[in-house]
Structures are given as C-alpha cells and as structure tokens.
C-alpha cells in the first residue's frame, strides 16, 4: 500500500479510501475508473458565440442532442479574469483543512470526498466550495484573509450567468419557435450556484474517481477547467476523454433540460478520473430553478409527469441514501419501464 502523508491543507481522503478498502467493498457493479491516457481524447463540438445567432443556436441544438456536451468560444469571459480566479482558488484550497471544514468560510459551503460512500466506487477524490450566488456578495459571507476572492467570484459568477442564459434561451428557442428571455423560469441568484473544485493528486488513481459518474440535476452547467484533463463523458456506450481547450468553456445539459425538451437534449453521464501526479482545478456554474418551480415541458405529449425541482432533488437524495446511486429522470416517467427500474 503506497504511503501518503496528508498535509495540513489536504482533506483526509486517503483515510476514507483505506477505511473502505478494509471493509472489502471494492466492487458493486460500477465499472472501475479508466485512466484518460488509455482513451482517445476527443474535442467536443465548438460553437463561437460571436457568430451568426441562428447558426450558433442550430449548432448548439445539434450538439445538445448528439453529445449533451459542447464547448463555446467568444463567450466574453476574459482569460485574465479566469486566471485570477484560478490563483485565488489555489490560495483558498491551500488553507488548512480544519479552517476549510470548520471555519465557516464562504457560508460553510466546503465539502470533500463522499460522506455517503459505501464502497470505493462511490468515493470522489476531490474537495469543493459550493456557493449560492446570492451569498457571494453577502456581508455575512466570510472570506477570511482572502480579500480579493469575493470580487473575483462575483465577476466570474456574473459572466458565467450571462453565458448560461444565452445558451439556455437559444436552445429553448429551437424547440418552442420563439425567443423567451425569461427561460428557464425561477432561476436567479438565490437558486443558482458557483462551485470551486479541486482534485488533489491521488496515489490510488488506478481505481479511484476524482468525481463519480453522474448526471447534473440542473438545467445546464457551464464549466471552466484547467489543462490537466480528466473529464470523461459517455458517448455511444463508452467513455470518451474530453480534450481541454484553453479558450473555451464547456456547457453540458442537465436533467431538467432533458425533461423539459422531451428527451431531445441529452443529460449525459460524466465523471472525472483521478490523476496520480497532478492536481486539477475547475469552476462550475449551475443554472437551477427554485425548489417550487415546475420543470415544465416544451410541448405535449411529454414522457414525464409534472414535477417541481424540489420534488426531483428530494427523490435524488432519497435514492442516493437508499441505494448509493442516483436514479434520476426514470423515476418521473409517466410510464416507467416494466419492473420500475431505470431505462
């Protein structure tokens, strides 16, 4: 077993790993992680948002239907801002673990690993701050000595919010035939989140996830990742490694958009593989509605019964607690598959 002395800033991920290993819970049917080096890297579809509006919308709709993921350039988020965000992010995660976990930073939004992990296949080798947009500028949000972090996070959140809205409105227009600037309803700074992620180098990378396979329980996600790589998505029943592109943001469709679009747009399973040598950083923006917001549909007939985001979120959390796995949209089908399991 490799020795791995964790520093003062590192979360006790190795302790979690070894505890699960001692329990002998290695294999529960989830395919083991696969190093990105063993897969062909693919560049996602790239859409330049400064191009012709109709052509951009068509390209995004095709990518959302075929891939569930795409990249956008010409997004208006300055490279200098993203680089500043990365510097501040590194300073934040270099703080002592006890300060991050118990110091109340960023409204106590710190999390690490997978508290509900019942086996190694449920363990995520990562740490994060998951921050509600409204709290970023709130006077009660504690940034400690990181005086520049508040302003940088606010700028990044505002910029990513504009990108998310632009993409969401364009994708919706392709299905309903007209422009609806308020789409999706119920999404504002009190319901959307900015997540700062760090994936530490992992000595058990061969059989550990950086982030376990999942789909996103939102309308859509906008991601800025570094150049380390590790993001993989399911395409044609196999995992595909996403090739990082420094000038692009990644957009992926969430479960709520798939339901609203009557399955035209795909919420695709994705994961992050652990890296034995390098740490990885990313920033994600989640476009979410209020808990009481109906998800709705672009038109009937819809394969899904009516539900709110709150109902969906509660069901996902209940499934994870009961089974260790997210079931997601199949729970809300009007006509579930025989046996009641996922499609």
Language model segments and positions:
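Peripheral, non-catalytic segments flanking oxidoreductase cores
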Residues: 1-343
């Amino acid at each position: 077993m490799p020795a791995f002395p964790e520093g003062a800033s590192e979360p006790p991920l190795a302790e979690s790993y070894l505890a699960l290993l001692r329990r002998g819970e290695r294999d529960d049917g989830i395919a083991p992680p696969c190093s990105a080096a063993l897969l062909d890297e693919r560049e996602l579809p790239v859409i330049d948002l400064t191009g012709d509006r109709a052509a951009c919308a068509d390209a995004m709709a095709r990518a959302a239907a075929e891939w569930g993921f795409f990249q956008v350039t010409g997004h208006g988020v300055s490279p200098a801002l993203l680089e500043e965000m990365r510097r501040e992010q590194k300073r934040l995660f270099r703080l002592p673990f006890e300060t991050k976990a118990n110091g109340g930073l960023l409204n106590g939004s710190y999390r690490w690993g997978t508290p509900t992990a019942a086996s190694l296949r449920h363990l995520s080798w990562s740490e994060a701050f998951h921050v509600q947009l409204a709290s970023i500028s709130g006077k009660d949000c504690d940034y400690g000595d990181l005086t520049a972090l508040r302003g940088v996070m606010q700028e990044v959140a505002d910029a990513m919010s504009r990108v998310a809205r632009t993409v969401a409105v364009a994708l919706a227009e392709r299905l309903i035939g007209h422009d609806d600037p308020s789409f999706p309803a119920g999404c504002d700074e009190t319901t959307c989140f900015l997540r700062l992620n760090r994936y530490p180098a992992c000595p058990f990378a061969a059989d550990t996830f950086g982030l376990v396979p999942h789909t996103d329980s939102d309308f859509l996600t906008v991601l800025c990742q570094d150049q380390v790589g590790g993001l993989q998505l399911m395409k044609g029943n196999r995992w595909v490694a996403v090739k990082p592109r420094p000038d692009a943001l990644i957009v992926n469709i969430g479960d709520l958009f798939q339901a609203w679009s009557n399955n035209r747009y795909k919420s695709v399973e994705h994961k992050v593989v652990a890296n034995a040598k390098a740490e990885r950083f990313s920033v994600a923006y989640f476009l979410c509605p209020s808990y009481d917001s109906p998800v709705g549909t672009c038109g009937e007939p819809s394969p899904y019964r009516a539900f709110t985001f709150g109902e969906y979120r509660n069901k996902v959390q209940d499934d994870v607690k009961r089974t260790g796995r997210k079931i997601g949209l199949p729970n809300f089908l009007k006509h579930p598959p025989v046996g009641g399991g996922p499609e």
